[in-house]
Amino acid sequence: MSRKQLALFEPVLLVQALTDAVKKLSPRAQWRNPVMFVVWAGSVLTTLLTLAMVTGQIAGGALFTGIISLWLWFTVLFANFAEALAEGRSKAQANSLKGVKKTAFARRLRAPRHDAQADNVPAAELRKGDIVLVKAGDIIPCDGEVIEGGASVDESAITGESAPVIRESGGDFASVTGGTRILSDWLVIACSVNPGETFLDRMIAMVEGAQRRKTPNEIALTILLIALTIVFLLATATLWPFSAWGGNAVSVTVLVALLVCLIPTTIGGLLSAIGVAGMSRMLGANVIATSGRAVEAAGDVDVLLLDKTGTITLGNRQASDFIPARGVDERTLADAAQLASLADETPEGRSIVILAKQRFNLRERDVQSLHATFVPFTAQSRMSGINIDNRMIRKGSVDAIRRHVESNGGHFPADVEQNVENVARLGATPLVVVEGARVLGVIALKDIVKGGIKERFAQLRKMGIKTVMITGDNRLTAAAIAAEAGVDDFLAEATPEAKLALIRQYQAEGRLVAMTGDGTNDAPALAQADVAVAMNSGTQAAKEAGNMVDLDSNPTKLIEVVHIGKQMLMTRGSLTTFSIANDVAKYFAIIPAAFAATYPQLNALNVMGLHSPNSAILSAVIFNALIIIFLIPLALKGVSYKPLSASAMLRRNLWIYGLGGLVVPFIGIKVIDVLLTLLGLLGLA
C-alpha cells in the first residue's frame, strides 16, 4: 500500500482544527457532549460573574473569577480542539478521495454488447442498469459488473496500490469501481448504483464522519459520564448551604471550579476524538468501515473464520509428487496428468505440467496440434481434463473422480483410496487422474503455510480469540494443515451453507464472529457475521454484504482489523480509568482550599502542601484543562497494544492508567502551584 499517511500534527490541520474548535463553542455543538456542556455552562456563568464584579454590580474578586473563567473556556476549547483535529484528519483523507472523482462523459450503449450504438452522456446521468463501454485510457464512470471483455485496470486512486489488476467478465473479478482507470483493452460494464451511491461516495461520507453515529459502547459510557456528572452536580449544589450554615459561604466561582474538577472532563473531552481516530486508523490500514459500530465490533470479536488459501497458506499449491495406482507406472500417470493440464492456466495446473517435464522430460504439447478438446473445471463437475481422439482424461477431487468412474462402469481401487488418505494426512491436497474408467493414480499438491502465522494465532489465543480455518479440502488434509498452522478448529469441505450455519452456531453461543469473503457465494455469510471484511477485488454482492472493505484485498488483514478494534476499545477504557482516577488528586487539592475556612479540620487533606486556597483552586483548574491537551496524541494514536488475555490486560491498564491517573495529578497540580507562587501571579500566591 502506498497511500500517504498523515503526520499526527500537520500544520495545516492544526490551524483548521483551532478554527473549528472556536466554531464548536456554540450551545448547539456543546449540547451533543453533556459533560462538556456543563463545563461550557460554568464558563458562561463565571464570565457573567466577572463582568458583574468589574462593573460593581456584585462584590467579589473579579481578577480571580476572571482567571478561573478563562481556564474553563480553555478546557472547553481544548476538548473541541481534540475532536476537531481528529475530524480534520478524516476530512483530509476524504479530500484525497474526492480528488479521484472526475467529471467525465460516458459511452452509454443502447444494447448490452461492445459493438452496439453508443451515446456520449455525462457520467452523472448514469443510472443503475445502464450499460457503458469503457476503453483504454478512460476513467470508469460508475460502480458495476463487467459483462463483456477484459482489461488491465489502475485502481491506485482507490487502493493506493500501484500494480494494475485484471478485471474481466464472469467469476469473482468482474466488479469494478468508479473513478479507476483502464490501462488496456476495453470493458462493457453494467452500472450497479445510482449517482451519489457509489463505493467512492460511501467512502467519502464515512470518512468525513458528518453522519457518524455513536456506537453502543460510546452510548453506554456517555450514560455513565452523565450519571457521574449529575451526582457531582447535586453534591456540589448541597455544599453551598453547608458552608453558609458554617458561617463562611463558599463563592459560586469556587463551586463551579469544584464541579468542573469533579466531573470526568478528561474522557468527556476526548471521547468523540477517540471514536473518530479509530475510524481514521482503520482507513490508514486501507480498510473502509461502513460505521464506527463495525470498528467497535472488531474489538469485541472472539471468533475468527479464516479462509485457508491466501490467509493461512500462501495459496499457490504446487504439484509435488505423482503416486501411481497399482499396475500403473509413474511415467504413464505423469503423461496423463500433463495432458489433462495442458490448457489449465491455474497455478496448480501449470505446476503439474512443469513437474512432469522435470521428472520424465515430457515436453509440453500443444492442445491444438493434438486436435484435442479441453474440458474446463466447473463447480458442478469439480474436474477438468482433455479429450484426445478416443481418450478421455480427467483430473479432479476424489469424490468427483469416484462418481465419474462409477458412472462409467468402473471401480475405484482401494490402493488409490489409501494413497489419497496418505497424501491428505501429510497436509497436501490429492488430485486423482483417470482415463476413461481406469484410475491412474494421485497427484499431490502441497500448499505452504505462511511464515509466522502460527505465532500470530498463538497471540490471538492469549487474547481469548478462537481461530477457525475454512477450507474446501477434505477432513484429513484440513486437519493436517490446521495442526501445522496452529488454528483452534477447522471447517472442511466448506460450502456457503456450511459457513452460514457455523456463524449462526457461534452467535447462538453469544460469541462475535469475524470473517472475510470476496465471492457472491460468500455474501450470505458476510451479511450474517458481526465483522465482515469484503475484498475490494471481489464481487459487488460481497462488498454490499460486508460492513468493511479491504482495499488491498488481503484476507490476512482481518487479524489487523481485530487489532485496531481492540486498540480503540483499550484506548477508551484506559483514558476513562485515567480520567476517573485523576479526580481523586483534584479532591485533595480543591476541597481543603474551598472549605478549610469553614471546617479547619479539612486542612489535614492538604497533603500536597499547596500555598494558598486561591492558588490550589486555580492549580487544579489549570491542570484539568492542560491534561486534555497532553492526552490528545494518545487519543489519536491509541494506547500501546499488546496481545494479552482480558485479565492481564485489565491488570496492566490499572497499573499504568489507574495508578498513573492517581500520581500524575498530584505532581502536576503541585508544579503549577509552585509556579504560581514563584510568579506571585496576580497576587494569588
UniProtKB/Swiss-Prot annotation:
Membrane-spanning residues: 34-54, 58-78, 219-239, 254-274, 588-608, 616-636, 662-682
Annotated binding of ATP, by residue: D344, E348, F377, T378, A379, Q380, S381, R382, M383, S384, K395
Protein family (similarity comment): Belongs to the cation transport ATPase (P-type) (TC 3.A.3) family. Type IA subfamily.
Highest taxon, organism lineage: Bacteria
Main subcellular location: membrane
Coiled coil (residue ranges): none
GO CC terms of this entry: plasma membrane
Pfam families: E1-E2_ATPase (PF00122), Hydrolase (PF00702)
Catalyses which reaction(s): K(+)(out) + ATP + H2O = K(+)(in) + ADP + phosphate + H(+)
Job description of the protein: Part of the high-affinity ATP-driven potassium transport (or Kdp) system, which catalyzes the hydrolysis of ATP coupled with the electrogenic transport of potassium into the cytoplasm. This subunit is responsible for energy coupling to the transport system and for the release of the potassium ions to the cytoplasm.
Topological relation to the membrane, as annotated: Multi-pass membrane protein
PROSITE patterns: ATPASE_E1_E2
Protein's name according to its UniProt entry: Potassium-transporting ATPase ATP-binding subunit
Molecular function in Gene Ontology: ATP binding; ATP hydrolysis activity; magnesium ion binding; P-type potassium transmembrane transporter activity
Organism: Salmonella gallinarum (strain 287/91 / NCTC 13346)
Active site positions: D307 (4-aspartylphosphate intermediate)
